[in-house]
């Protein structure tokens, strides 16, 4: 300031003076700016911008991954986990969409949930693994899907279901295990969805074990007169069975005898 001056000096950009007859200018505060020389006022940084220093002629745009949610700000704020911001100069962050997640702060993008995982909510920092009995077979899924009857899944995070093995069935949705066909029944094919799919052993045959895929013919000297037998019956004394897979025993003819059980002929 010079005494006896014949002119007035302008405040430079970044400074201002609201009063008359002053000998100096004020530097713009942090969070504010003065864009033009000879200004009487400072201006607050707008939403999406900030200024950490004094005496500035402009504000800084928030960087991607950050935001400024109030005017007159001196700093930008990192987007929290579960949110992201791909653009600069923004006043807020975007929630991760359903089927997506954001695991870190200051992220500029969201990430798709991988196969075997899903996320039904928005704004999340991780995806959920598919539960046992369920599967997720695509990326970015917002739900898990139940295994249909005839299939099952015992593990978490699966991308498909397992088909019921031969000798087994699955009769409910979202099953975590298959059920073995009971003794006396069998199933030669995969994917059974009902206990009724297990077939009873035919007469002349038997099934001794659960989870069987085939029936077994009764051996010589034995027979099965009923369906669904788990063992064959031995021919009684006085009777014989001389062929496999027999449905009945035969009496010894007149003049012949048989004292023992399970025989194939008479004496």
What are these regions (language model features)?
Residues 1-267:
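Disulfide-rich, cysteine-dense extracellular ectodomains and adjacent flexible linkers of secreted
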């Amino acid at each position: 300031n010079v005494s006896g001056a014949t002119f007035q000096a302008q405040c430079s950009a970044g400074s201002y003076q609201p009063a008359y007859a002053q000998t100096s200018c004020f530097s713009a505060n942090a969070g504010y700016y003065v864009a033009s020389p000879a200004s009487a006022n400072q201006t607050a940084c707008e939403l999406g911008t900030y200024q950490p220093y004094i005496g500035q002629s402009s504000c800084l745009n928030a960087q991607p991954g950050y935001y400024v949610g109030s005017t007159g700000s001196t700093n930008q704020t990192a987007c929290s986990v579960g949110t992201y911001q791909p653009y600069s100069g923004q006043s807020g962050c975007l929630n991760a969409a359903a089927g997506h997640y954001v695991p870190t702060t200051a992220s500029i993008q969201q990430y798709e949930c991988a196969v075997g995982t899903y996320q039904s909510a928005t704004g999340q920092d991780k995806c959920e693994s598919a539960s046992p009995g369920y599967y997720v077979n695509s990326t970015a899924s917002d739900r898990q899907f139940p295994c249909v009857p005839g299939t099952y899944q015992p593990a978490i995070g699966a991308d498909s279901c397992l088909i019921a093995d031969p000798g087994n069935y699955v009769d409910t949705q979202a099953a975590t295990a298959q059920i073995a066909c009971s003794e006396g029944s069998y199933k030669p094919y995969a994917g059974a969805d009902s206990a009724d799919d297990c077939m009873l052993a035919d007469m002349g045959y038997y099934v001794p074990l659960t989870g069987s895929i085939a029936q077994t013919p009764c051996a010589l000297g034995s027979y099965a007169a009923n369906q669904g037998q788990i063992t064959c019956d031995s021919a009684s004394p006085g009777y014989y069975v001389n062929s496999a897979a027999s449905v009945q025993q035969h009496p010894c003819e007149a003049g012949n005898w048989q004292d023992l059980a399970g025989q194939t002929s008479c004496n």
